[in-house]
UniProtKB/Swiss-Prot annotation:
CDD domains: TilS_N (cd01992). Its main location: cytoplasm. The gene is tilS. The keyword Cell cycle does not apply. One of its GO terms (biological process) is tRNA modification. InterPro entries: Rossmann-like_a/b/a_fold, TilS/TtcA_N, tRNA_Ile_lys_synt, tRNA_Ile_lys_synt_N. Its EC number is 6.3.4.19. Keywords: ATP-binding, Cytoplasm, Ligase, Nucleotide-binding, tRNA processing. This is tRNA(Ile)-lysidine synthase. ATP binds at S21, Y22, G23, S24, D25, S26. It comes from the Bacteria. It is found in: Cytoplasm. Ligates lysine onto the cytidine present at position 34 of the AUA codon-specific tRNA(Ile) that contains the anticodon CAU, in an ATP-dependent manner. Cytidine is converted to lysidine, thus changing the amino acid specificity of the tRNA from methionine to isoleucine. It catalyses: cytidine(34) in tRNA(Ile2) + L-lysine + ATP = lysidine(34) in tRNA(Ile2) + AMP + diphosphate + H(+).
């Protein structure tokens, strides 16, 4: 089991943060990174949903101490409904906060081939488009850091063999057996058996599909100007820009994208000007000065964007959209 050379090259020249749970996947990735002599620290969420949750946290602290690594831990609140989405949002918000505050270049995730195929099937079942169906990439640029998934083309069976061969300790997550979570239902009934039998062909297919995705959507069309992400008025490009800001859109939200200026998920704003989409963090301002409002009116700056420009002292004349 090996990490690709191009991913290793990135890891060796940046400051790295590993999302760690002490489950099988992140434990395997921990020791694989150690084997490759990659420097990294740990970040962990304790959801307190399992009987071993606090023990996992304690053991993670001991592991970090043993190998001289920093570890950042946060306890999640009890989510009353829609656990999967709320837990994911909570997790990534904390990961991003640590990356920004501690200047990490890379957030390393332990997603593997089985996860990639599960995601594919989940999105397919929801009627998603190509950009969402192929939502996982080995290297995914966010605004201030990059997501890296070194195990994305490695199967769960290969990870299990690595753990057994190296005699690596990890905690079994019993919640993975609970089919009330949609991902677990897909895993148990559809994806795992398929990946076990056809993993080599699946790896090739996902590799080809990713190349096709890049050519089709040309994500280089997303430009950044002073914190604003700007792209042509194209649903998939806009969804990608929103994801770069840390928000994964639902099918219902995607349907609203091209209808006009809006706020997505209460935190990401979308505005249009001259057939260009502008994606940015949603902000408000108590009162805009009259002269600034007039400058915005003359320049035809979308109303939703004005508070952001004012708060960040962005010169309107410097904007090229």
């Amino acid at each position: 089991m090996q990490i690709k050379d191009e991913i290793l090259a990135l890891l060796k020249k940046g400051k790295n943060l590993l999302a760690f749970s002490y489950g099988s996947d992140s434990s395997a990735l921990f020791y694989l990174l150690m084997q490759e002599k990659i420097d990294f620290d740990l970040v962990m969420i304790n959801y307190k949903t399992r009987k071993n949750s606090d023990l996992e946290e304690l053991k993670a602290k001991e592991l970090a101490l043993k190998f001289h690594k920093k570890i950042f831990i946060k306890h999640a609140p009890k989510f009353q409904s829609n656990f999967e989405k709320k837990a994911r949002d909570f997790r990534y918000d904390f990961f991003e906060k640590i990356c920004l505050e501690q200047d990490y270049d890379h957030l390393i995730l332990a997603h593997h081939l089985n996860d990639q195929f599960e995601w594919f099937l989940m999105q397919l079942s929801r009627g998603a488009g190509l950009a969402e169906i192929l939502g996982m990439q080995e290297c995914e640029k966010r605004q201030n850091y990059t997501l890296l998934r070194p195990l994305l083309f490695i199967s769960k069976d290969e990870i299990s063999s690595f753990l057994k061969e190296k005699d690596i300790f990890y905690f079994h997550d019993e919640s993975n057996e609970n089919e009330k979570y949609f991902r677990n239902y897909i895993r148990k009934n559809f994806s795992n058996a398929f990946v076990s039998e056809f993993h080599q062909g699946l790896k090739r297919s996902f590799s080809y599909l990713d190349e096709d995705r890049k050519k089709l959507y040309d994500f280089e069309n997303i430009k950044e100007i002073q914190g604003l992400l700007i792209c042509p008025k194209n649903e998939s490009l806009i969804a990608r820009a929103v994801k770069m800001k840390g928000l994964l859109l639902s099918t219902a939200q995607r349907k609203e994208l091209l209808k006009g200026d809006c706020v997505l998920g209460g935190k990401i704003a979308l505005a249009y000007k001259n057939e260009q989409a502008i994606v940015f963090e949603y902000e408000t301002c108590q009162k805009l000065p009259k002269n600034f409002k007039e400058e915005c009116r003359i320049a035809k700056i979308p109303r939703l964007l004005r508070a952001y420009l004012y708060n960040h002292k962005i010169d309107i004349s410097s904007l090229s959209f």
